[in-house]
């Protein structure tokens, strides 16, 4: 008892509280209550059929159910009030009433879900028409009616999908921990973009709001060295389980299968780990991440790393948000589920199976028994950058073998590498200044855009990465689902020691990754084995002697950035103010680049003038 209050005082307080009229509690996500057990000793033997209490099915999609209820209210508002302005006001009043009654959560009535409500309203209208047709028909019919309804539902989803209506899917660019990135063409402006699709499964109210909030944070990242963000939206996708597959062949499926076939040949980059950002103010007390990393260092010294992001504990609900690699169910027109495999089977996503929740396994079993599911798909439209720093380094390494004189080979020139690294540090300084830690900086997540090869940091995930599980991480294949307080994320060769060890990390973890990238920029490698050996040796302070002699300043900062003590690593601001970028050679390099750009502009202007003079001569 706090405050030294008496028992009588507490009783009086309780009586006063009971007499007051309290608002009904919000029925957001009711906690499951175990079934009561009764004494069945006197029950006849023939009636003792069920020895165990019946397991009531769980409902992990309460958010989707509330969204459907809100859509019904909006639909009724439009039916009873033809005036659009008045119907909107009626809808808001109805929502406020239902919120006060505790039947709805306020966030489901927000504008962020307007596109989903439009999807629902169209589906409701279609179903009402179908029901009317059914009533007017002969009730004694075969089952072809339900098949007809199912095909109409799928066609309706295609009509209400913004992604299918506005974009043409051209190719798959790669995949990360939260979804796949596709190269698309906008049907209206004809421009090419990159769209990342993230499948949201079993979303709770709190986690949905986190996703929406953090998408807005990503939209606020405006910097020349950050991949441009255009827009984001949420759609419903209809996922059919394998036992209810619909034999529909679509062009988009064929295109996807071709690219997936090319992936094994190196045509599609398969990200080694999930890329994500976190807010710098997050502390271990607020996080409960779980990850299991498998580092294999075989005879060829090739190191592969698999990192799994896990759930941050939520006080409001046991269920959590799961962002899954979408596979073939990224659009409403793709009924065949590829990644929803039975427990114990592996998908094409590398990684150990983990679980932080005993109830998650039950949810999976329920998913396996369900005929159809409706999920939310988050689409993030970004600037298209097809050339990554990984590609540039690979090409540089190939050309360095052919170049005898380093000064004559622009792909190995230290000045070019310095320019790339400086722009990279400027981008990292910007995101750190915004309070964001990337956690997975590596050449595959860094892009070179345009003719001047401007550096763009990309492949940002969501700041709620610690409450997210990948599809392959739902359940541990070894049956070990005990959560641990570790946070091993990032790719092994570029991840800091504190990340791999699961201890606390901050922006200095990104600085370690920059140190490894700095070494790779200034040290060409002849083979993959040599690269893996050198980058692994950096962890123990070993830097190639040839690099130390050729680039002593860079070697010095590589040593500082890759030190085990994170506090002693220089920050991004300290790097920008260091001798790395303040030498006379770098100033001359910048001036030379500007002169070259001006010369190109002069040549282009001369060509345009000559064309104009020719046109005038023809007219005369």
Swiss-Prot record:
Activated by autophosphorylation; phosphorylated predominantly on serine and threonine residues, but also on tyrosine residues. Autophosphorylation at Thr-486 is required for kinase activation. The active autophosphorylated form apparently is largely refractory to cellular heme fluctuations. Ubiquitinated and degraded by the SIFI complex once the mitochondrial stress has been resolved, thereby providing stress response silencing. Within the SIFI complex, UBR4 initiates ubiquitin chain that are further elongated or branched by KCMF1. Gene3D superfamilies: Phosphorylase Kinase, domain 1, Transferase(Phosphotransferase) domain 1. Disulfide bonds: none annotated. It catalyses: L-seryl-[protein] + ATP = O-phospho-L-seryl-[protein] + ADP + H(+); L-threonyl-[protein] + ATP = O-phospho-L-threonyl-[protein] + ADP + H(+). Residues 18-28 have a biased composition (Low complexity). The modification Phosphothreonine is found at residues 283, 484, 486, 491. Residues 1-38 are annotated as: Disordered. InterPro entries: CC_SR_Kinase (IPR050339), HRI2_3H (IPR054521), Kinase-like_dom_sf (IPR011009), Prot_kinase_dom (IPR000719), Protein_kinase_ATP_BS (IPR017441), Ser/Thr_kinase_AS (IPR008271). Keywords: ATP-binding, Cytoplasm, Disulfide bond, Kinase, Nucleotide-binding, Phosphoprotein, Protein synthesis inhibitor, Repeat, Serine/threonine-protein kinase, Transferase, Ubl conjugation. ATP binds at residues 173-181, 196. GO terms for cellular component: cytoplasm; cytosol; nucleus. A motif (SIFI-degron) lies at residues 85-104. It is found in: Cytoplasm. The record marks 80 as: Heme-binding. GO terms for molecular function: ATP binding; eukaryotic translation initiation factor 2alpha kinase activity; heme binding; protein homodimerization activity; protein kinase activity; protein serine kinase activity. SUPFAM superfamilies: Protein kinase-like (PK-like). In normal conditions, the protein kinase activity is inhibited; inhibition is relieved by various stress conditions. Inhibited by heme: in presence of heme, forms a disulfide-linked inactive homodimer. Heme depletion relieves inhibition and stimulates kinase activity by autophosphorylation. Inhibited by the heme metabolites biliverdin and bilirubin. Induced by oxidative stress generated by arsenite treatment. Binding of nitric oxide (NO) to the heme iron in the N-terminal heme-binding domain activates the kinase activity, while binding of carbon monoxide (CO) suppresses kinase activity. Metabolic-stress sensing protein kinase that phosphorylates the alpha subunit of eukaryotic translation initiation factor 2 (EIF2S1/eIF-2-alpha) in response to various stress conditions. Key activator of the integrated stress response (ISR) required for adaptation to various stress, such as heme deficiency, oxidative stress, osmotic shock, mitochondrial dysfunction and heat shock. This is Eukaryotic translation initiation factor 2-alpha kinase 1. It comes from Rattus norvegicus.
């Amino acid at each position: 008892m706090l405050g030294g209050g008496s028992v009588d005082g507490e009783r009086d307080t309780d009586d006063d509280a009971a007499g007051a009229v309290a608002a009904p509690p919000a029925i957001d996500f009711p906690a499951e209550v175990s079934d009561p057990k009764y004494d069945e000793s006197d029950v006849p033997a023939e009636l003792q059929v069920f020895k165990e209490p019946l397991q009531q099915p769980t409902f992990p999609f309460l958010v989707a159910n509330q969204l459907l209820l809100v859509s019904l209210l909006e639909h009724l508002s439009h039916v009873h009030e033809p005036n659009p302005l008045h119907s909107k006001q009626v809808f808001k009043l109805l929502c406020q009433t239902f919120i006060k009654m505790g039947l709805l959560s306020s966030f489901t009535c927000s504008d962020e879900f307007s596109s989903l409500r439009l999807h629902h309203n169209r589906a409701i209208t279609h179903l009402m028409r179908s029901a009317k047709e059914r009533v007017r028909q002969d009730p004694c019919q075969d089952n072809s009616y339900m098949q007809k309804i199912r095909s109409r539902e799928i066609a309706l989803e295609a009509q209400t999908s913004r992604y299918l209506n506005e974009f043409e899917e051209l190719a798959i660019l790669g995949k990360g921990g939260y979804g796949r990135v596709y190269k698309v063409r906008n049907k209206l402006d004809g421009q090419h973009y990159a769209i990342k699709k993230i499948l949201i499964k079993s979303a709770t109210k709190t986690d949905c709001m986190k996703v929406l909030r953090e998408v807005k944070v990503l939209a606020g990242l405006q910097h020349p060295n950050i991949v441009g963000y255009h827009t984001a939206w949420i759609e419903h996708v209809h996922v059919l389980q394998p036992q209810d597959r619909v034999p529909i062949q679509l062009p988009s499926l064929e295109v996807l299968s071709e690219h997936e076939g090319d992936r094994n040949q190196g045509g599609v980059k398969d990200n080694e780990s999930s890329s994500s950002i976190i807010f710098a103010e997050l502390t271990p007390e607020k996080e409960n991440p779980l990850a299991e990393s498998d580092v294999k260092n075989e005879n060829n010294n090739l190191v592969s790393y698999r990192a799994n992001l896990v759930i941050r504990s939520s006080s409001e609900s046991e269920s959590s948000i799961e962002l899954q690699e979408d596979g073939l169910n990224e659009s409403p027109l793709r009924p065949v589920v590829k990644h929803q495999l039975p427990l114990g089977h592996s998908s094409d996503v590398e990684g150990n199976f983990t679980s932080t929740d005993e109830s998650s396994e039950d949810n999976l079993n329920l998913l396996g028994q369900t005929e159809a599911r409706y999920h939310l798909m988050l689409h993030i439209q970004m600037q298209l950058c097809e050339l990554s720093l990984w590609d540039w380094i690979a090409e540089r390494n190939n050309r360095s073998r052919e170049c005898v004189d380093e000064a004559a080979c622009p792909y190995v020139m230290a000045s070019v590498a310095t320019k790339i690294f400086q722009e990279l540090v400027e981008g990292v300084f910007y995101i750190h200044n915004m309070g964001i830690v990337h956690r997975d900086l590596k050449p595959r997540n860094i892009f070179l855009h345009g003719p001047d090869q401007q550096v763009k940091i990309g492949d940002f995930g969501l700041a709620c990465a610690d409450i997210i599980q990948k599809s392959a991480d739902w359940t541990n294949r070894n049956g070990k689902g005990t959560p641990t307080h570790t946070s091993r994320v990032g790719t092994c060769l570029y991840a800091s020691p504190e990340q791999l060890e699961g201890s606390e990390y901050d922006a200095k973890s990104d600085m370690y990754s920059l140190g490894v990238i700095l070494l790779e920029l200034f040290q060409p490698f002849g083979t993959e084995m040599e690269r893996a050996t050198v980058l692994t040796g950096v962890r123990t302070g070993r830097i190639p002697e040839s690099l130390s002699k050729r680039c002593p300043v860079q070697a010095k900062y590589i040593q500082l950035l890759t030190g085990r003590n994170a506090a002693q690593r220089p920050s991004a601001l300290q790097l920008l103010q260091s001798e790395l970028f303040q030498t006379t050679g770098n100033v001359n390099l910048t001036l030379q680049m500007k002169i070259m750009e001006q010369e190109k502009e002069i040549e282009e202007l001369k060509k345009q003038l000559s064309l104009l003079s020719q046109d005038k001569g023809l007219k005369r």
